[in-house]
Amino acid sequence: MRFSPLYSGSSGNCSIVTIGKTNILVDAGMTGKAILSALETVGVDPCKLNAIVVTHEHSDHIKGVGVFSRKYDIPVYANERTWKAMSPLIGDVSMHNIRTFVNGQNFYIGDADITPFNISHDAADPVGYSFCGGGARIVYMTDTGCVNETLRTIASGADLLFLEANHDVDMLKRGPYPYPLKKRILSEKGHLSNVAAGEFLKKLFPTGVRRVILAHLSRENNTEQIAYSTVRQALVDDGIPEKEFFLTVAHRERVTGIFDL
């Protein structure tokens, strides 16, 4: 299994999961040109993409979905409510490429066993994903205003966790956003803070989670260094030695790297 965050942040999101010969884009929230450039960087031919799986209908996750599906004849997977919400936003998609799933029920795309799960965000029916194959498991969990025991159970034991660390609460409160937007971000239907991500990871460490990529950082209310330092310190303060975990931050405007599992 291989995972590459191509772009991650409040301005656009797209990652690729490769299991065996199966290549799956998770969201396509950048322009087609930008996604093509990133795929070239990680050595994936867009003609060999097997699917796009969509987390929710916000523009920073679907901007390139329609373009890519039409140009490369790629199936697009989303639940019914997300399809209904995003259809007017992405243009026509061929009927044979419209695929739906039910949250909580696994499905297969080639070599990948995928389970979509509910998250808490102000979208029609947002999901995260668990990808299994090749003896490994990746959990993709962004755009969630809170984490609960159900999400902890889903993430437990993951070989790699792609986890939102959207904002520093103090930066957000002091920043230029209007109050209603600040309130939305801080709500249970908003985004996960650095501190909340750290607290969540402390509970996951005993389950075997050791590799974590922090994701979906806000441009205005966070920095890579602040997110990394806050989460790292939470783990260290909990008595977890640094040598026992791998922690990094997904980049906003360039490929973060290639992670083999």
Where are these regions (language model features)?
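Conserved beta-strand hairpin/beta-sheet module of binuclear metal-dependent hydrolase folds
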Residues: 1-42, 127-143, 160
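Structured catalytic core of nucleotide-sugar glycosyltransferases
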Residues: 4-14, 55-65, 87, 116
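Active-site neighborhood of phospho(di)ester-bond hydrolases with catalytic His/Asp-centered motifs
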Residues: 26-29, 50-57, 77-80, 139-142, ...
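Active-site metal-binding motif and surrounding structural segment of the metallo-beta-lactamase
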Residues: 33-78
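Active-site environment of divalent metal-dependent phosphoester hydrolases
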Residues: 59-62, 84-85, 124, 147-149, ...
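Metal-dependent catalytic neighborhoods of phosphoester/phosphodiester hydrolases
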Residues: 63-72, 87-89, 222-229
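Metallo-beta-lactamase
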Residues: 80-128, 132-135
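Cap/insert and terminal regions of metallo-dependent hydrolase folds
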Residues: 149-248
